[in-house]
Amino acid sequence: MHRPLPALPLAKRGMSHNGEESVPRDYIVKKLLQRYWRLTRALTLGAQGAIVDPEGRVLLVRHTYQPGWRFPGGGVEKGETVAAALSRELEEEVGVTVTGAPQLFGIYANAASFPNDHILLFVVRSWRQERVPDPNYEIAEQRFFTPGDVPGDISAGTGRRLAEIFASAPRSAFW
C-alpha cells in the first residue's frame, strides 16, 4: 500500500534510491523528537490558596501523607482551568467556597516534587466557609494562624510564601 507523503514544501522533499519522492531523514528525526519531548517533558500544575480571614490570619492544612503545615490546594486536572481547580480543591479540602476573584500571587517551579511541576499560588480574601470538613484520608487538620505565629513544623515552601505575602520578602521563582 502506498501512503501519501506528508504535506511538505517541495524544497524539503528528497528522492529515494529508486527515484521515488521521499521524506528526508532529518525531518523524520525532528518529528519523532518533537513527539518524544511532548511525552517526556510534560508539565504538572497545581493551584494553592492562601486563604486570608478578616483578621489577617491564614488557613493552613496538615496532610495525612506528608509532614508540615501547608496551603490547601491540589492539581489541575486535564481540561480544567486553574481557577476551577483552585475552587474545587478548596471546597474539597477545607470546605471553602471562593466568592470573589482570587489574586494570583506567584508561579513557582517545584522541582522537589517533580522536575516539571509548577504551583500557582493565589491569595483568597473573598470566601465563605459554611462547614469544616471532618479529618479524612487526606487532611488531618486545618487551622487559622497569624502570619507571625505559625507552627514550627510548617513546610519550608509555605514558610517562604508567607514571608513573601505578609513580610514583603523578595519573591523566588522556586517553591
PLM segments and residue spans:
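Acidic, metal-coordinating catalytic segment for phosphate/diphosphate chemistry
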Residues: 2, 16-48
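Nudix hydrolase/Nudix homology domain
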Residues: 4-18, 67-68, 137-175
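Conserved Nudix-box catalytic region and its N-terminal flanking loop in Nudix hydrolases
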Residues: 53, 57-93
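Short, well-ordered beta-strand micro-motif
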Residues: 51, 121-125, 144
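A short coil-to-beta-strand element that immediately follows conserved catalytic motifs
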Residues: 97-106
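Active-site-adjacent beta-strand/loop module that shapes the phosphate/pyrophosphate-binding cleft
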Residues: 108-131, 158, 165-169
